[in-house]
Amino acid sequence: MAHVVDSNTLDRIFAEVDRGFDQQMQMLSDLVAIPSCRGEESRAQDFMAHAMADLGLAIDRWKINVDEIRHLPGFSPVMVPYDDAINVVGTHRPSSGVGNPRR
């Protein structure tokens, strides 16, 4: 079942997006200025890890092991070395397991 968001909540969301727009565009500009083609991803990954950590997210990094993903649907043959291919993920871990109290 879809949750309908009232117009006041939508207005607040849009206002917050607008308020942070210039900062978001600067971050995107800084990110795309970093060379990040295959084999050169580490600086861009570090940039994103720092940005996500600044937001309070828990950072997880791991090296891609091609043998562990080879059997997965959609796997594409690897044509370049993955020696420096590191995945970076930021995860929000709430302070409590309680969901939205308004629901």
Protein language model annotation of sequence segments:
Residues 2-103:
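Acidic/His- and Gly-rich active-site-bordering loop/insert found
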